[in-house]
Amino acid sequence: MGVRAAPSCAAAPAAAGAEQSRRPGLWPPSPPPPLLLLLLLSLGLLHAGDCQQPTQCRIQKCTTDFVALTAHLNSAADGFDSEFCKALRAYAGCTQRTSKACRGNLVYHSAVLGISDLMSQRNCSKDGPTSSTNPEVTHDPCNYHSHGGVREHGGGDQRPPNYLFCGLFGDPHLRTFKDHFQTCKVEGAWPLIDNNYLSVQVTNVPVVPGSSATATNKVTIIFKAQHECTDQKVYQAVTDDLPAAFVDGTTSGGDGDVKSLHIVEKESGRYVEMHARYIGTTVFVRQLGRYLTLAIRMPEDLAMSYEESQDLQLCVNGCPMSECIDDGQGQVSAILGHSLPHTTSVQAWPGYTLETASTQCHEKMPVKDIYFQSCVFDLLTTGDANFTAAAHSALEDVEALHPRKERWHIFPSSCGGCRDLPVGLGLTCLILIMFL
């Protein structure tokens, strides 16, 4: 009497890979390690008839629940780690409850190893809250990604929100929500963002006497109140005073164990992060040398939620033409505060030449993009080596917060106007004109 062979699993890797490609937000963006690949093979993403498990072993039910809990998550969004860890703990608990029935089952043991590997990768604690196995009926009103982060489009499809990035650093250099890059004067107080959810204002002061170049020495951020989530919170930083708390002395907003708004001090007096779950927004503030830098990621639908009277927002519309340094006209005069013809040789800041400035910037930024050009520009116009670190940190913030990797680097190619071009192409011209 012959023994009937079990159904073949030879197609499992292809099936698992195809399913993974249809779920871009399920796993972290880094390449999966071998254990994670093994988990993918065991996830129960296969058709019911491909690899039958004994009826008493419920590993496929555990896996199906885990997929349902994580399919809507966006790895680039605030709160991803917390929600992913909750789902992993729920998955681990489910496997423990079915462990006796699954003893000796390869799929079960692969899943257990994969869960352990993922929990280690994401720094998940074994103890803590777990996700509900009915995620469709659980909504956190103070988590943007729970109540508003997934939008319905035509045909009933759901897509994650579109994020925007804005950054300000150096003399100052502005990267707008549209990825336009500008070098501006904007001396005094100016609004970067002023919408229905968030207000950000910076104050800029002259860097070098007699020059139009300025840099930021004060940042004020207002997280506006939202019912049930947080009271209004104000954060203010000035040179040599970068607090790890709001002006009222608190470090968070909202009730419960998971705060809807909180501050994380990354480097004492030098670098803080603010995470606002209720509006899906992240803000980085740094001090490098005597000046501050700022980087912000915010959902597009919230960033564009403002009244007509709030249209003066540098992150939205860029600097006014009158405030642009790289305006394509009289650039040397704009930078150095002198009235010089373009044929006159203009000296850079003592101690720096184009070659030495380029060498110093290249050590931090091997890619000669607009951040490298900004670094060279700042060294030549101020002589302050701290601006090298500012440009490098600004690029790191882009890589941490900007949602589209292909747009991290911006490359100047020709001279042109501040408002008309998507990037500060005039910056290259400014550097070259100084050495004509």
Swiss-Prot record:
It is a lipid-anchor; GPI-anchor. It is found in: Cell membrane; Membrane raft. Its main location: membrane. The keyword Membrane applies. The record marks D171, P172 as: Cleavage. Keywords: Autocatalytic cleavage, Cell membrane, Disulfide bond, Glycoprotein, GPI-anchor, Lipoprotein, Membrane, Signal. This is Repulsive guidance molecule B. It comes from Mus musculus (Mouse). The lineage of its organism: Eukaryota, Metazoa, Chordata, Craniata, Vertebrata.
